[in-house]
Design a protein with these regions (language model features):
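Short helices/loops that flank or line small-molecule/ion binding pockets
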Residues: 32-46, 132-148
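Ligand-binding cleft/hinge of the Venus flytrap
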Residues: 10-21, 102-104, 108-129
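Short, glycine-/small- and polar/acidic-enriched structural segments
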Residues: 44-45, 52, 64-74
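Short loop->beta-strand "edge-of-pocket" segments that line small-molecule binding or catalytic clefts
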Residues: 1-4, 90-110
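N-terminal hydrophobic or amphipathic helices and topogenic motifs
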Residues: 1-33, 39-43, 58-63, 84-89, ...
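Periplasmic-binding protein-like
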Residues: 68-75, 159-177
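A ligand-binding cleft/hinge motif common to bilobed small-molecule-binding domains
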Residues: 47-59, 140-170
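Flexible hinge/capping segments at coil-to-helix
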Residues: 69, 78-99
Length: 177
């Protein structure tokens, strides 16, 4: 569950193809839900990009081994040429900007909400903050289709949309728990 990517898909395929491997049944859930499933023993492993402290708080009392899989860049999906000149979370408060958010519980949303809090920015000042997409692909699609000016997600997804540019913000770590 949790996040998915080409690298993760390859790993899961190798695990199930191994002579001593078991079939891998995958469920796409946000980071909070997949860790909840792990905590209540409805899942055996979880892929997540939440930070280590968040992971440990969501599965208290359960011994975990975290396997660091890879780092990847996350940032803003914007129209080609970045006409709104978006470069930071502060720019999301511009009244001309309409944001497409991720759903509560996704690592992107958790990171963004934490960043807004650190910078003292109220979500009420961000037009579209309550608009939620369930994946990076759907949030990038919203910008591509001009339903929003900006969304926050993984750099790799921007490559699927020739009319989008990507503005990097930070790197996230993918873990297997």
């Amino acid at each position: 569950g949790g996040q998915t990517s080409a690298a993760l898909e390859l790993l899961l395929g190798k695990m199930s193809a191994h002579p001593e491997g078991l079939p891998v049944l995958q469920s796409h859930m946000n980071d909070y839900n997949v860790l909840y499933s792990l905590y209540f023993e409805k899942a055996h492993i979880a892929a997540t990009s939440l930070d280590i402290d968040d992971i440990r708080h969501l599965v208290p009392g359960i011994p975990l081994i975290l396997l660091s899989l890879y780092k990847y860049s996350v940032g803003f999906y914007v129209q080609a040429g970045n006409p709104e000149k978006i470069s930071s979370v502060e720019d999301l408060t511009d009244p001309k900007v309409v944001f497409m958010n991720r759903e509560k519980g996704s690592a992107r949303r958790v990171y963004l909400d934490r960043l807004l809090k650190e910078r003292g920015i109220s979500s009420e000042k961000i037009s579209g903050y309550r608009n939620e997409a369930v994946s990076d692909m759907s949030s990038a699609s919203a910008v591509f289709e001009h339903r929003a000016n900006v969304a926050f997600g993984e750099e790799m997804i921007a490559r699927y949309f020739p009319g989008l540019d990507f503005v990097p913000v930070t790197d996230m770590q993918m873990y297997l728990a």
